[in-house]
């Protein structure tokens, strides 16, 4: 037996669940926890970000790459109020993340406007689990529950609120931290009749497509996906979170779909007469449901029953693990009526797939070919590909540049493309890139960001330099929120709220001790990238670009000006209405 502080129990519980990285912010409520970390093996694995929001994005970047809550946040009371945006991304993007919120003295709870009492209930709509710990002997149990929920299905954020007086209190530690708990393995088998029905639909379709989402990556299903696609000769489209689960150099790879996706993928989805959806929420980022995609008949497979049939109505809904379902499918396909064991290159739909992919590849090459300035962002990505290795990670922020970053990256592995995939939150890129670099120190991390996005978190260059995180940041500058500049001009003939002045980005990077360089000729991009790599430092490369290239102008994702919402004519309610929303019945398209 030993007498231990609550802070020590918190650290021991995090160690028990395999925490690799701690991102924490100091304040009076986190003093005891900071001291406890310094005395543990995690003391050398603590990052103190410039802001709590930047730190929460680092946690997301780390855990997205690792596919578990390997990084944990520990935050000083009022700083917790900055976490919500990153936690919302973790929820809808299915990123496992445990956050420890250290609140003010618990004896003040419930008093009218007590100083610095964080309303922990504000996390309830966002986190998949929100707990308030009010007894010291419950600390370990609460953290155990947080990991169980965060790494479950669906994955997401879990928040544990602990009053800081408990971190200073002492108690006999016997049996207070659950020991030997194992993570549940999600191996959900589908009913045999559902597997046979899916196999029959796949074989009978003239132009089938497999849509592979992030659930395929999380299940470790890349090998099964490759075997299934080649066995049936079915082209593979991925969602944004599924990018890389199928090697994008393969002849059956159509790339990622959606409004930031590849045109070959969107064309393939539009031409399909049947889609096998594996491990996807069917969200806007995954397939651009709000803009372009009308689904044919499809079978929807996911571990989360809550996402089945919520937007589209599938022919068959299956609650199953993506990898397990594919393995079941591979087993029954040879006995399915109409199945032919022939090379995928000989199947009828292969020619159409190659035509779509060739057209897309040709278009991308055209975008990469120009030598003029402002530079093409596709050209920048072409130069990145020359130095990119299979293990390297591409991170993009949100804006016009997102399309060239998605379209220019050719991935061989899952979880190599990182951004705010679920919510599209501006400013996520730089801290997520730092988190990804922390998670995989032997990988190169290339970030593409707009100047507007970089304004959010450029202060985290301190973390990059202090911890020797050699992220290579390409900041595409045009002194505007380019996507909105284009759309505002298209719709209203003016660009209010979209332009701003830039600082000396290269000078700022150098002031922090990072490498910095400004590109003034397109032909200099390759050399700048190599010099950044050779420096071994965090690096910033400024690349001037136009305001119009990318998401809002190029229709390859089926979007472009289609992002604009046409107003509807709503009749005036002159007599009043007894029922809220009554006039919605009379809306005109």
UniProtKB/Swiss-Prot annotation:
Q: Which SUPFAM superfamilies match?
A: DHS-like NAD/FAD-binding domain, Thiamin diphosphate-binding fold (THDP-binding)
- The record lists thiamine diphosphate as bound by 52
One GO BP on record is:
L-valine biosynthetic process
User: What protein name applies here?
Assistant: Cyclohexane-1,2-dione hydrolase
Q: Which UniProt keywords apply?
A: FAD, Flavoprotein, Hydrolase, Magnesium, Metal-binding, Thiamine pyrophosphate
Short name of one Pfam family: TPP_enzyme_M
Origin species: Azoarcus sp
Keyword RNA-binding in record:
no
Q: Which cofactor does it need?
A: Mg(2+); thiamine diphosphate; FAD
On assembly, the entry states: Homodimer.
**Would you tell me the Gene Ontology cellular component terms?**
acetolactate synthase complex
Q: Where does Mg(2+) bind?
A: 451, 478
Keyword tRNA-binding applies = no
Q: What general EC class does the enzyme of this chain belong to? A: hydrolase
Q: Where are the transmembrane segments?
A: none
What the record notes about the co-factor is:
Binds 1 Mg(2+) ion per subunit.
Q: How does activity depend on pH?
A: Optimum pH is 8.
Which reaction does this chain catalyze?
A: cyclohexan-1,2-dione + H2O = 6-oxohexanoate + H(+)
Described by its record, this protein's role is as follows: Catalyzes the ring-opening cleavage of the alicyclic alcohol cyclohexane-1,2-dione.
* Thiamine pyrophosphate binding as annotated region, ranges: 400-480
The record's similarity note reads:
Belongs to the TPP enzyme family.
Q: Which PANTHER family match?
A: ACETOLACTATE SYNTHASE LARGE SUBUNIT ILVB2-RELATED, THIAMINE PYROPHOSPHATE ENZYMES
Per its record, what are the GO molecular function terms? acetolactate synthase activity; flavin adenine dinucleotide binding; hydrolase activity; magnesium ion binding; thiamine pyrophosphate binding
Q: What is its EC number?
A: 3.7.1.11
